[in-house]
């Protein structure tokens, strides 16, 4: 079993190229393990940057999805534009940065 040390839990970051982060009204990060939703975080849980949204996982969350998991984000802007992205990836203790077109 992998040991996760304090301060080494991953941050999942989405970088937006064509959407102003300040215009995002709703965002949901979902991490699925198999067919089950293991973690769900909202915009209020996010660290908001100029062109990024980031979510930091706790040690318990990281252990619950360690290995292959599907990471998804869905968002809606204040103008009603919707978008989403999903990717199956290996989640370890490093940081993960994904670009959203």
Predicted regions and their residues:
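Contiguous segments within soluble domain cores/interaction surfaces
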Residues: 1-101
């Amino acid at each position: 079993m992998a040991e996760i040390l304090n301060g080494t839990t991953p941050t999942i970051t989405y970088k937006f190229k064509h959407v102003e982060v300040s215009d995002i009204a709703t965002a949901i990060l979902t991490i699925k393990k198999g067919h089950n939703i293991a973690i769900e975080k909202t915009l209020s849980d996010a660290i908001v940057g100029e062109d990024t949204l980031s979510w930091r996982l706790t040690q318990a969350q990281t252990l619950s999805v360690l290995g292959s998991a599907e990471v998804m984000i869905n968002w809606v802007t204040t103008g009603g534009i919707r978008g989403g992205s999903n990717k199956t990836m290996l989640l370890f203790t490093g940081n993960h940065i994904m670009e959203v077109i």
